[in-house]
């Protein structure tokens, strides 16, 4: 279900629109614009998306069209939750 009004269209930064015409400029390109939508012209390109610290390499496929670039470069680390308490660890105050 689209969140943006249809009459507004999808948002794409101006420099990405210029690269849409010249596909060879988009290959392995650094992208800081996480808010831009992925267009069908970008399919089968490798881009590097900035996550706030480093650039994450990502291949654009047909399934990613219509989504934002920022959805594919996570900004937070995944830390698995610790469920069991080992024998040397304390439980905390009671």
Curated annotation (Swiss-Prot):
Example GO BP: ribosomal small subunit assembly
Gene3D superfamilies according to UniProt: 30s Ribosomal Protein S19, Chain A (3.30.860.10)
Pfam families noted in UniProt: Ribosomal_S19
Ribosomal protein is among the record's keywords: yes
Source organism, top-level taxon: Eukaryota
Keywords: Mitochondrion, Ribonucleoprotein, Ribosomal protein
Predominant location category: mitochondrion
Gene Ontology terms, MF aspect: RNA binding; structural constituent of ribosome
GO cellular component, as recorded: mitochondrial small ribosomal subunit
Tagged with keyword ATP-binding: no
InterPro entries: Ribosomal_uS19 (IPR002222), Ribosomal_uS19_bac-type (IPR005732), Ribosomal_uS19_CS (IPR020934), Ribosomal_uS19_SF (IPR023575)
SUPFAM superfamilies in UniProt: Ribosomal protein S19
Entry's localization field: Mitochondrion
NCBIfam families: rpsS_bact
Protein family (similarity comment): Belongs to the universal ribosomal protein uS19 family.
Protein name per its UniProtKB record: Small ribosomal subunit protein uS19m
Organism field: Petunia hybrida
């Amino acid at each position: 279900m689209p969140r943006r009004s249809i009459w507004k269209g999808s948002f794409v930064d101006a420099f990405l629109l210029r690269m849409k015409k010249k596909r060879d400029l988009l290959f392995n390109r650094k992208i800081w614009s996480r808010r831009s939508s992925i267009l069908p012209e970008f399919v089968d390109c490798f881009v590097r998306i900035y996550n706030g610290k480093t650039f994450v390499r990502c291949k654009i496929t047909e399934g990613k069209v219509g989504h934002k670039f920022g959805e594919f470069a996570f900004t937070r680390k995944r830390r698995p939750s610790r469920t069991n308490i080992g024998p040397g660890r304390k439980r905390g105050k009671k």
